Amino acid sequence: MLSQFKQDGKKAVLGELFDFEKDVYPVGRLDADSEGLLILTNDKSLNDKLLKPSNKHARTYLAQVEGQCSIEAAAQLEKGVTISLDGTLYNTLPAKCEVVFGEPVLPERYPPIRYRKYLPTSWVRLTLIEGKNRQVRKMTAAVGFPTLRLVRESIENLKVYGMKPGDVISISGNELYKKLNIK
């Protein structure tokens, strides 16, 4: 599903999930290969308040990576790594990184990731305060562990726990601002 409302090709779009009002739009984006939390709002000021890196709002992702992610790679991710953005080298801001032991409880992905019998996978939890295009995927690849599956599990204290793909919940503006630590 694409994080847009109008049909563009063969992929499903948000407008097919629910009859949203005309002035509702997504805050940020999820690419077509990513899953998880997406905030939809009619608050035009929220995008800047939430996504501007100087405001330091944490976004946490679970990434299933190819191979067994090492403690050394996690330490590199925490310090920040160099990635390419539109052909220009960019040093990411430091991030929180945790190697997740075991399989996180997540809904099945459709379509499933490619499976290779002799290639192990592992999970890392990355918390960023910036959101460059395909940043998590580029960061994990930069330390030798390409991302196979990517799930945004939270933005600040707003979490997807207990939700299924396609679930839509409605919360008040005050409650949203409180969960997002926006004053």
Predicted regions and their residues:
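RNA pseudouridine synthases
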Residues: 1-183
